[in-house]
Structures are given as C-alpha cells and as structure tokens.
C-alpha cells in the first residue's frame, strides 16, 4: 500500500508536467503569431511610404521634364525672334545702302542724262535740217532722189538700181566715192534714214588679198565686226534698214555715195 501511494502521486506529477508543456507550447505559438502580426504592420507602412516617394519622384521628374521642354521651346522662340530681328536689321541696312547707292547713282547719272538730252536735241536739229535739205534737192538725170549732210559728211542717195560697179561709177560722176562707213554710229544713222530697200556701200571682197576691203583701201572701226559676220565672199556688201550683208556684185541695188565736204556741191 505504501508502493501504490508513492506511484500515484508520481503519475499525477507526470500528467501535470504534460499539461504544463502543452500550455507552454500553445502560449509560445500564440506569442509568435502575435509577433508576426506586430511585425507585418511596419512593412506595410514602409511599402506604402516607398510607393508615395516613388510617385513623388515621378511627379517631380515629369514636372522637371515639362519645364525643361518649355524652357527649350522658349529659348528657341527667343533665338528665332533675335534672328528675325537680326535679319530685319540686315535687310534694313541693305535697303538703306541700296537706297543710298541709287541716290548717288541718280546724282552721277544726272550729267549723263543732260548729255543724252543734248544729243537728242542735236539729233532732232540735224533731222530737221536734213529734211529741209532733202526737200531742196534736185534730180540731175542720174536718179539722185535726195542728199543730205550730217556733221561734216554728206550723203547722196542714187535711186536707180544698178550693179556695184555701176554704183561706183555713178558716185564718181558726182566726184564723191561710194560711201565708206566709219563706225557703228554712222551705220545705225544710215539704217535709220534709208527706206525699205537695199543699197550698195563701198565694201567689197579683194580677191588678190583674200579679204574684205573698203573703197580706196580705207580703214573703218567696223572692220572687226565685219570679220565676225563671216561673209561668204560673194563679192560686194549692201546695206538695208535691218542689216549689212554680202551678195553677188551684179545684183541691182540702189546706191549711197558719201564724203566729207566743206560745202554742198553745185
């Protein structure tokens, strides 16, 4: 009986130890769960805070980029405005310079304009004198229709058609050679006064020298121009209102005689 009494309390002790262990285990598990719950709350706050910070950074970056582009665009507009003003300034300066040059040119051209007006008046005077002389001309039986003088040179227009040799002979009858044109101005003057016909002039092809030569081997400032015309060496040259050209010397044309004279012949 004494052994049973001893054993029973021992068994109760073991049971109470198991209960205590179970209680402790459950308490420990509860403490861990509570600890996990307590620890999970700060991590959520950290994630939220980081999200807010990232959002703020994105907003700041977006604002910065927007401002940067606005600044770049504004700077570009300013540069364009400055360039436009610079171009306008250059254009205004060029305009002023051209205006000044035109003013100076008009001042420089004033004497030339006065000279041209003087020449025009002289031309009109000569034309009127030429007309009066032409009206007083007479027919001598050799077909002289009219004659006139310009400056110190007089011209005879023989209005019967003949060959170049015949023209030369008719001019010699008046003691005046077939006309030799001195320069471009005289050529234009004669072309302005002839009617719509062709006239022999004192230029023919010298077969011995193989070149074009004026009557009596005279010199003319038209020689270079005649060389550039590339005449076909057909013999003789005639003048019309539009051109001078070579042709067969036996072609019948009117005739122009001309010579520098001190007075009109009787």
UniProtKB/Swiss-Prot annotation:
Receptor on natural killer (NK) cells for class I MHC. Residues 67-266 are extracellular. InterPro entries: C-type_lectin-like, C-type_lectin-like/link_sf, CTDL_fold, Ly49_N, Mouse_KLRs, NKR-like_CTLD. Keywords: Cell adhesion, Cell membrane, Disulfide bond, Glycoprotein, Lectin, Membrane, Receptor, Signal-anchor, Transmembrane, Transmembrane helix. Residues 1-44 are cytoplasmic. The lineage of its organism: Eukaryota, Metazoa, Chordata, Craniata, Vertebrata. GO terms for molecular function: carbohydrate binding. Glycans are attached at residues 87, 104. One of its GO terms (cellular component) is plasma membrane. SUPFAM superfamilies: C-type lectin-like. Disulfide bonds join 149-154, 167-255, 171-257, 236-249. It is found in: Cell membrane. This is Killer cell lectin-like receptor 8.
